[in-house]
Amino acid sequence: MRNRKLGIDYSSDDFEGCPVETTLDIIGGKWKGILLYHLIDGKKRFNEFRKLYPKITQRMLTLQLRELERDGVIHREVYKQVPPKVEYSLTEFGRTLEPVILHMKDWGEKYKDRIDKLEAARKAEDKI
């Protein structure tokens, strides 16, 4: 990996133990942050996530939820009833990520216009 601004080459070993990388290992991924954000308000069912974000495929949603469950961030509660009912909620460990997710939301709101302009400029540049 190369930092172009500083002109420094890094190996992947240079980032081992980096706290930011540790955090991103847990919440990184296109949908994980969004899923966690919606779980801050309380339990959600699988189809509630599908309705909130219809662009996420069932397979991807399943994978992201499984990874969060595997990492101890969310709890999957299966109710013994017909039809089956499954709810997802934040674990105590998952709740420790709440301020991180809320800060990310605040940052996104603050800089959304700037990011949108950058994205538009990139798209215009790609057309050239």
UniProtKB/Swiss-Prot annotation:
Gene3D superfamilies: Winged helix-like DNA-binding domain superfamily/Winged helix DNA-binding domain. SUPFAM superfamilies: Winged helix' DNA-binding domain (SSF46785). It comes from the Bacteria. Coiled coil: none annotated. One of its GO terms (molecular function) is DNA binding. Keywords: DNA-binding, Transcription, Transcription regulation. Disulfide bonds: none annotated. Residues 18-116 form the HTH hxlR-type domain. It holds the Pfam family HxlR. This is Uncharacterized HTH-type transcriptional regulator YdeP. The gene is ydeP.
